[in-house]
């Protein structure tokens, strides 16, 4: 099954951090993302990967 692609605001809500923090993670390539029509989307399974590395 394909991972759900989340906009930065939804990824931030699920991580419990500000949207700017998710955008910073994308910019610094500290979280996996996919570009769709020029907009970065975070796969929902990348949130768990990030949580595992951040702890």
Label every model-predicted segment.
Residues 5-10, 32-55:
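Short helix-start
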Residues 1, 26, 35-37:
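Short, solvent-exposed coil/turn segments
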Residues 21, 25, 50:
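Residues in the recognition helix of alpha-helical DNA-binding motifs
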Residues 19-20, 44:
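The DNA-contacting recognition helix of HTH DNA-binding domains
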Residues 12, 25-26:
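Hydrophobic alpha-helix position signal
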């Amino acid at each position: 099954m394909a991972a759900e692609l989340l906009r930065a605001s939804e990824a931030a809500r699920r991580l419990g951090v500000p949207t700017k923090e998710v955008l910073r993670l994308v910019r610094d390539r500290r979280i996996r993302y996919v570009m769709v029509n020029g907009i970065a989307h975070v796969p929902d399974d990348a949130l768990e990967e990030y949580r595992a590395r951040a702890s």
